[in-house]
Amino acid sequence: MDTKLVTIDSSSNKSGVAWFVNGIYKEHCLLNCSRYKNMDERFEYMSKEIWMALNEYKPDIVYIEETVVLRNAQTQRFLTRLQGVVYAWCMNHNCEFNTIRPTSWRSAIGMKQGRNIKRDQLKEQAVKYVLEKYGLSVGDDEAESICIGDAVLKMFGDVGV
């Protein structure tokens, strides 16, 4: 039986989703809701898009990037609520739900991080990693979702495969 893993790099504008089967990367998608300027509309749209992606991929295991404390409380609430939407999907579909800290997944795949490494540099590293490993030219949201998947597989083996 196949083991399906979905990894999510969520944000309030664009979220990357990656799909792995039996420990092998299969595909990714970008959920873009940046056209919605109102945060409540954006949340509803992003929630529905993530729900549809989960329905399509039918994962056994989900890893979503843990929300980190931000200066923007509105964005923090958005991401925390979005995590709840993913958790609810998992509960309703007998799917294992997990979060992973950005520092953990970056460390697992050998990314340089620390006080002197800026956010944009971290995103560039993710894009470069995916280009070098998979030959894919993707944006940072998709890249980070793929990186999260690779890190999970490296940290925990083939997660049920």
Enumerate the predicted regions with their spans.
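Phosphate- and other anionic-substrate recognition elements at nucleic-acid/protein interfaces
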Residues: M1-V161
